[in-house]
């Protein structure tokens, strides 16, 4: 099971260089399992026992199984994760010519660790909107091959490089695509039109706009003498999306189960398709009874907000509270914060711990040092919007928000096991 799950994650990461591609990958796997796509612009002919999924903005997805037992009797079991990761996104008018090199201006998306982006073989992927035969259409593209690089400055020209050199995102991050003659800047939209034709055999009249990000072409891999680790881009938080999907597909059909994978978590979730937008409320509002019955269902339901946790780093162990340093390959982590940066309370933490005990999965706790700030997740946002009990959990990770992150290769099995038990649990607290 461990080998199969890890290989499935590696394949999912490779197929999902952007939130758009992640959403498409999830949708494809759901359809293969018999889930029916619902269009938000059309009526929804749903029924008990039905399995459905909905997408918004091509980058967020909600899948729901309406169980044999009514949600009014047993509530909903929800797992939440996010599809986006910190990256470098191409600006609307990106063409640059500096010293005879064609470069693209980029904007930093989210709280990225910038230094690891240098000297990587980068490709480009995302969504392109274009006009064809008088109609406006959109299509996903992925160059797949390494087409760009951000070279470091030699240490001979920057003697302070190893003494905490600050990176200027405006000047030092534009990737190099090619050498050009004279003042030529290159035509980026023409390049995108060529890619549309090459990848999809689409002859666009004109490329109107795009949402594209660079990514590292190095594939995720199992590493270490004993393959104890999995290294790859976007583990935060596609690892949780993958685990949630595997658990949903493995769960029984008695209970009503929901998988929520939203975009824009890394920048605050405030969007039409983010956790702080109306997407989940509107989908549940159309699938469930309204009014008093809806509130009753919400109060019987539970959300597991799954987002990677900070594992205790052997070189920086002092960055953790001594009693709350999660270890890789030691099971999922319950995240606690008294200032509600995480939505966990004693009842929801206790229930998750109970599930772990039942399926013999090790479980850990994380509390940030009292003299450090704490990040947050979609957990508190969803809990406050729906009034739903929530537990924040995640798998321990090193190098979070780097271009290449590291997690334990045993932990994915632990997480899928306990999430499957959660989806199948006949009782909630």
From Swiss-Prot:
Residues the record lists as binding Zn(2+): 82, 156, 401
Enzyme Commission designation: 3.4.11.-
Pfam families attached to this UniProt entry: Peptidase_M18
Signal peptide start and end residues: none
A single GO cellular-component term on record: cytoplasm
Keywords linked to the UniProt accession: Aminopeptidase, Hydrolase, Metal-binding, Metalloprotease, Protease, Zinc
GO biological process assignments: proteolysis
Cross-referenced HAMAP family: Aminopeptidase_M18_2
Cited PANTHER family: ASPARTYL AMINOPEPTIDASE
Identification of the protein by name: Probable M18 family aminopeptidase 2
């Amino acid at each position: 099971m461990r080998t199969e799950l890890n290989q499935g994650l590696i394949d999912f990461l490779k197929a999902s260089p952007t939130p758009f591609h992640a959403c498409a990958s999830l949708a494809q796997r759901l359809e293969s399992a018999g889930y029916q796509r619902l269009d938000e612009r059309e009526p929804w002919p749903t029924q008990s026992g039905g399995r459905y999924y909905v997408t918004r903005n091509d980058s967020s997805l909600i899948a729901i199984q309406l169980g044999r037992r009514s949600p009014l009797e047993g509530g909903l079991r929800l797992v939440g994760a996010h599809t986006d990761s910190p990256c470098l996104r191409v600006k609307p008018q990106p063409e640059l010519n500096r010293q005879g090199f064609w470069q693209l201006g980029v904007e930093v998306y989210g709280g990225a660790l910038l230094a690891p982006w240098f000297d990587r073989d980068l490709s480009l992927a995302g969504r392109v909107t274009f006009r064809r035969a008088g109609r406006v259409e959109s299509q996903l593209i992925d160059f797949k091959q390494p087409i760009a690089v951000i070279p470091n400055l030699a240490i001979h020209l920057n003697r302070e490089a190893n003494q905490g050199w600050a990176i200027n995102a405006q000047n030092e991050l534009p990737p190099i695509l090619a050498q050009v003659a004279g003042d030529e800047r290159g035509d980026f939209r023409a390049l995108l039109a060529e890619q549309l034709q090459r990848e999809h055999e689409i002859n666009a009249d004109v490329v109107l706009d795009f949402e594209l990000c660079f990514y590292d072409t190095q594939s995720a891999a199992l590493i270490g003498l004993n393959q104890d680790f999995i290294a790859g881009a976007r583990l935060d938080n596609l690892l949780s999306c993958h685990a949630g999907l595997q658990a949903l597909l493995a769960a029984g059909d008695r209970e009503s189960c929901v998988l929520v994978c939203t975009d824009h978590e890394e920048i605050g979730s405030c969007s039409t398709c983010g956790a702080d937008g109306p997407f989940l409320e509107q989908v549940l509002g159309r699938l469930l009874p309204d009014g008093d019955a809806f509130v009753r269902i919400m109060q019987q339901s539970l959300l597991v907000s799954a987002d990677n946790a900070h594992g205790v780093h052997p070189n920086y162990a002092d960055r953790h509270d001594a009693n709350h340093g999660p270890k890789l390959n030691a099971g999922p982590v319950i995240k606690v914060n008294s200032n509600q940066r995480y939505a966990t309370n004693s009842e929801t933490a206790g229930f998750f711990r109970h599930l772990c005990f039942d399926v013999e999965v090790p479980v850990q706790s994380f509390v940030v040092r009292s003299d450090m700030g704490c990040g947050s997740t979609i957990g508190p946002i969803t809990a406050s919007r729906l009034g739903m009990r929530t537990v924040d959990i995640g798998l321990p990770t090193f190098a979070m928000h780097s271009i290449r992150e590291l997690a334990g290769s045993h932990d994915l099995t632990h997480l899928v096991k306990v999430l499957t038990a959660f989806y199948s649990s006949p009782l909630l607290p």
